[in-house]
Amino acid sequence: MTTDIIYRHKNQVYFNITNKCPCRCTFCIRNTEDAIGEASNLWFEHEPALEEIYKAIDEFDFSDCNEVVFCGYGEPTMALENLMAVSKYIRERYPFRIRLNTNGLSDLIHKRSTAKEICQAVDSISISLNMPDAASYNEVVRPAYGEKSFDAMLKFARDCKQYLDDVRFTVVDVIGEEKVEQSKILAAQNGIPLRVRKYSP
């Protein structure tokens, strides 16, 4: 199970701590592949317990690593307690930067504001903007929380920016040039940088 919890991809180390996700994004790689990078399988037979994640960390070779990323075949904030504990565990043992890749729906998942505690646990946050407007977002992301998801994601991003300098939005270039340009405008309006990622199926 160790390989599934921690894996390397493009010279970075990723923590896959849950398979739970409130979204069904049309472009999500987990729709077509069982793994990416050096992982053999990112689908869990059961959700990993905290002790299993610790064991995976203790056994993993972090050579040449300077940043770990919470990102896998699930939304990391679905396992928020484990995320917080694992971040603390890493910080006590390694000098790594810690990044969270998230859909930004943590407040809806937990029915409360979560930005402050999350920002205390990580060094940077990358939030999947995905689309520049609510209608397009709902069509592509298909969030379990419906129409309120888009505004909740934007609010979460703005809240994070109050506590952490390194917060950014991301979109994938497959959405098209027009949507990318609109996303740049929206990101600027919210005072948050935007990174355009190349789609790699």
Residue ranges and their predicted role:
Residues 48-73:
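Short Fe-S-cluster ligation motifs
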Residues 32-38, 64-68, 133-137:
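Short, basic/glycine-rich phosphate-binding loops at helix/coil junctions
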Residues 3-49:
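Canonical Radical SAM [4Fe-4S] cluster-binding loop centered on the CxxxCxxC motif
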Residues 7-9, 61-63, 119-120:
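Flexible, charged surface loops at secondary-structure boundaries
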Residues 1-2, 54-57, 111-115:
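A generic local structural motif
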Residues 73-201:
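Conserved AdoMet/S-adenosylmethionine-binding subsite of the radical SAM
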